[in-house]
From Swiss-Prot:
Gene name linked to the record: yfhJ
Domain of life, source organism: Bacteria
Protein's UniProt name: Uncharacterized protein YfhJ
Amino acid sequence: MNMYIEKLTNLLLEKNEMISYIQAKTWVELLWSDFEATYAKAGHAYQGEKMTEKIVTQWIENYGGQLHLFQSSRNDVNDYLNQSRGLLH
């Protein structure tokens, strides 16, 4: 999985110059786990890392350039995502 996370982190950094490496990796890990959890809760059989990579890649391609604008209603999530706001790649 680490290989996929690194590849997707680099893709997100290409799409969004407003976030740091740590933020990009955090986003990728959150998107990855969110997809797998949601897919499982919906009762679908696990399709493997390739399926998760495909979906997260699509999300990054479609929304990656705007992820730095995201604000959660949960303060703990905002704190987590903003932990390295000033250290761009």
